[in-house]
Amino acid sequence: MSLVVQEQGSFQHILRLLNTNVDGNIKIVYALTTIKGVGRRYSNLVCKKADVDLHKRAGELTQEELERIVQIMQNPTHYKIPAWFLNRQNDITDGKDYHTLANNVESKLRDDLERLKKIRAHRGIRHFWGLRVRGQHTKTTGRRRA
């Protein structure tokens, strides 16, 4: 195994991707998971689509590779990532498939809950009351309230 010496100024300890600080010391597949809306499977797929070495540290990547990764994460359908892989399929407003990232995840979730409360759906009412939403038993559990 040969020793590869990197240039001194090329390693970045902290990267800024999609309004999130990403640690440059960990491998790129796991470093991308610090971005909200990106899990290990999605991160792995994006790195493969961007032709990035999966064993590289995040701080070792060039600016071009990082831009390619961000571009694929923001427009996954243009890079033949299937719709079932995305976290927002058949959106309620326009019926398209999206993958929401970073700050957008929280705002979309908040909008969905507000819509459910507004139309007085069962799930919305349970959220409003602070009760369990997904059909769990509540006779003996979940009594502690904030």
Curated annotation (Swiss-Prot):
Ordered alphabetically, the record's keywords are:
Acetylation, Cytoplasm, Isopeptide bond, Methylation, Ribonucleoprotein, Ribosomal protein, RNA-binding, rRNA-binding, Ubl conjugation
Modified sites of kind N6-methyllysine = 48
The cross-references to Pfam families, in alphabetical order and at most eight, read: Ribosomal_S13 (PF00416)
- Covalent cross-link Glycyl lysine isopeptide (Lys-Gly) (interchain with G-Cter in ubiquitin), where: 36, 49, 80, 96
Q: Which residues carry this modification: N-acetylserine?
A: 2
UniProt PTM: N-terminally acetylated by acetyltransferase NatA.
A GO biological-process term: ribosomal subunit export from nucleus
GO terms (molecular function) for this protein are:
rRNA binding; structural constituent of ribosome
Q: Where in the cell is it found?
A: Cytoplasm
Task: State the Gene3D superfamilies in the record.
Answer: 1.10.8.50, 30s ribosomal protein s13, domain 2
Q: Name one GO cellular component term.
A: cytosol
Top-level taxon in the UniProt lineage: Eukaryota
Please state the protein's primary subcellular location.
cytoplasm
Q: Which SUPFAM superfamilies match?
A: S13-like H2TH domain (SSF46946)
Quaternary arrangement and interactors, per the entry? Answer: Component of the small ribosomal subunit (SSU). Mature yeast ribosomes consist of a small (40S) and a large (60S) subunit. The 40S small subunit contains 1 molecule of ribosomal RNA (18S rRNA) and 33 different proteins (encoded by 57 genes). The large 60S subunit contains 3 rRNA molecules (25S, 5.8S and 5S rRNA) and 46 different proteins (encoded by 81 genes).
Q: Which family does it belong to?
A: Belongs to the universal ribosomal protein uS13 family.
Alphabetized HAMAP family for the sequence: Ribosomal_uS13 (MF_01315)
Instruction: Reproduce the miscellaneous comment text.
Output: Present with 48100 molecules/cell in log phase SD medium.
Protein purpose:
Component of the ribosome, a large ribonucleoprotein complex responsible for the synthesis of proteins in the cell. The small ribosomal subunit (SSU) binds messenger RNAs (mRNAs) and translates the encoded message by selecting cognate aminoacyl-transfer RNA (tRNA) molecules. The large subunit (LSU) contains the ribosomal catalytic site termed the peptidyl transferase center (PTC), which catalyzes the formation of peptide bonds, thereby polymerizing the amino acids delivered by tRNAs into a polypeptide chain.
Protein name stated in the entry: Small ribosomal subunit protein uS13A
Supply the source organism for this entry.
Answer: Saccharomyces cerevisiae (strain ATCC 204508 / S288c)
Gene, per the UniProt record:
RPS18A
